[in-house]
Structure formats: C-alpha cells, structure tokens
C-alpha cells in the first residue's frame, strides 16, 4: 500500500520523510510545495517495522512518527514545527503563520484547538478504514463501533465550532488569506472524504465548511498531495487492499487518531451516539 519512494528535488539540503496516509504528513508536504522550497521527498513505509527500529528512532525521532524534516545535521519533527521552521528559514509569506502578533496568536490558537478536536476526530476515519484493514476486518466493521462513534462525535462537535466560529464571517479559518491552519484542517477532511465518513446529508448542514473545503481542494498542490489517499482508501473500500499489506498490526496505529479514549464527547451528551448523529444530520451546525 505504500508508494514508491520519490526524490523529486534530488541533491538539495532539505529532506522530508513522510507517508501520504498521514494527515499531518500531507499538510507538511503540501506546505513545502506551497512556499516553493527545494527539498527531497522520502516515503517511509509505515506498513513495516521501520519506524519501530531503534536506529530509526535514534537518528530521526524518538516517537517513530512521521513527518520528519532533515536539514543537514538538524532534524525537526511534528508537522506544525516543520512548517514553521521552513517558513522562518526561507522567509515565507506572512499569511502562513501571521504577519503580526495578533495574527500569529490566532493561527497558533487554531492549531492548538485543532490538535485536540479535529485531529482526534480522525478516529472516525481511522476506525472505519485503516483500523479495520489492519485487524483483518472489512471497512466500517461493527467490531469497532464504540471507537467509530467516539471519533465521529468529536468530529461533528469540531465541525460545529469550525462552521459557527472559525468560518463564521471569513473565507479561511484565520482570516481572508490561507494559512497553515487551513492546510492542517483541510487534510483531516481529505481523509474523511476519501473514506466516505461524512454523509451528504451532514455536509448540507455545514455549508461554510463545504465551501471552504472546495476552495482548498482547488489549490494547485492539494490534488498532488492528496491523490494517494483518495486512490488507496478507495481500493480498501472496494476490497482491493487487504491486511496482508501490513507486516505488523501496530502499523498506522501510532497517530493521535488511535487514542479515541480521549474523545470525551459521548459521556456528557446524555444521549446515545446514534441519536446524536441523527440530530446532526437533521439540524447541522446548530446541534454539533
């Protein structure tokens, strides 16, 4: 299921280690293209045990996660840290992380909010698609209903805040210009779209998010970076990719999306998850 390693910008100093199945990897990857810096691409095959090997962790990242940026002898990991480092080093446009104190604060605020809301809502995608694949189940398996419901609950709650607050009166999540905050959030929805997680009737209740997602999808590099996810998740859904692709069950279980136990939405809803989902489908952002 992993793509072949590519080195499009061979011979340059920067090297990005990533895998296109990962939402944070895709946002960092797209950002490198957006600001047009020379870099080498190296796909890390996370379906194997490579990121579990001690030599990999000692050399690149003690957590074993990607993306990782290598700049000569210096290594930085975590997608936001990578993007901010590259933006500062190459004097990127101010819109990406803010031109002034207040703009920077707002973008930082969104990225921190995103990390424990939309990012954790990725459990809805993970436990319907990759989690099922890894454990030999068909996509959307009821075996993981609890995890799927936890992820979808947090996803819908986050969508409510995104619709009613962040996109209330502007085109992008932090203003009238695209920022890295948009890329981070956008690639969460790429996974949900690829996995058919959000029904059309739910999208209808979030028109601002739908318009924003369409706008981000039309950016020149969005398709290039997202194509692998759409193609391969489609194959999983059609049964063309199976668990035999993975050489270890912990593969792809390292991201934030696996920790669905952190999703605390259901206990305080005082209603069954399915009842909540029906309300969101009917009333949209007014409920979420």
UniProtKB/Swiss-Prot annotation:
Question: What metabolic or biological pathway is this protein involved in?
Answer: Xenobiotic degradation; dichloromethane degradation
Induction profile: By dichloromethane.
Entry EC number(s):
4.5.1.3
Gene Ontology cellular component annotations, sorted alphabetically = cytoplasm
Record bears the keyword Lyase: yes
Query: A GO BP term, please?
Result: glutathione metabolic process
Name the UniProt key words of this record, in alphabetical order: Cytoplasm, Lyase
From the UniProt record, list the reaction(s) this protein catalyses.
dichloromethane + H2O = formaldehyde + 2 chloride + 2 H(+)
Q: Which positions fall inside the GST C-terminal domain?
A: 100-252
Q: Name one GO molecular function term.
A: glutathione transferase activity
Listed InterPro entries: Glutathione-S-Trfase_C-like, Glutathione-S-Trfase_C_sf, Glutathione_S-Trfase, Glutathione_S-Trfase_N, GST_C, GST_C_Theta, GST_Theta, Thioredoxin-like_sf
Pfam families attached to this UniProt entry? GST_C, GST_N
Write down the Gene3D superfamilies for this protein, in alphabetical order.
1.20.1050.10, Glutaredoxin
User: Subcellular localization, per the record?
Assistant: Cytoplasm
Family membership: Belongs to the GST superfamily.
Name under which the protein is recorded: Dichloromethane dehalogenase
Quick one: which gene encodes this?
Answer: dcmA
């Amino acid at each position: 299921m992993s793509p072949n390693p590519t080195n499009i910008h061979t011979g340059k100093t920067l090297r990005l280690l990533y895998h296109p199945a990962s939402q944070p990897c895709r946002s960092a990857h797209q950002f490198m293209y957006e600001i047009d810096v020379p870099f080498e691409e190296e796909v890390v095959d996370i379906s194997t045990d490579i990121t579990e090997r001690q030599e990999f962790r000692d050399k690149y990242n003690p957590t074993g996660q990607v993306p990782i940026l290598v700049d000569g002898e210096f290594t930085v990991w975590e997608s936001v840290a990578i993007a901010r480092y590259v933006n500062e080093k190459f004097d990127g446009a101010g819109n990406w992380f803010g031109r002034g104190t207040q703009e920077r604060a707002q973008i930082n605020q969104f990225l921190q909010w995103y990390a424990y809301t939309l990012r954790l809502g990725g459990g809805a995608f993970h436990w319907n698609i990759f989690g099922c694949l890894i454990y030999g189940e068909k996509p959307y398996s009821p075996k993981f209903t609890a995890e799927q419901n936890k992820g979808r609950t947090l996803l819908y709650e986050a969508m409510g805040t995104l619709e009613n607050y962040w996109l209330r009166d502007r085109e992008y999540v932090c203003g009238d210009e695209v920022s890295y905050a948009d890329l981070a959030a956008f690639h969460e929805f790429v996974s949900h779209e690829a996995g058919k997680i959000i029904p059309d009737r739910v999208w209808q209740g979030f028109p601002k998010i739908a318009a924003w997602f369409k706008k981000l999808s039309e950016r020149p590099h969005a398709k290039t970076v997202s194509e692998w996810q759409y193609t391969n998740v489609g194959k999983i859904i059609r049964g063309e990719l199976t668990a035999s692709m993975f050489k270890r069950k912990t593969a792809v279980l390292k991201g934030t999306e696996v920790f669905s136990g952190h999703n605390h939405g259901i206990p305080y809803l005082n209603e069954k998850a399915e009842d909540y989902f029906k309300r969101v489908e009917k009333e949209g952002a007014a409920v979420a």
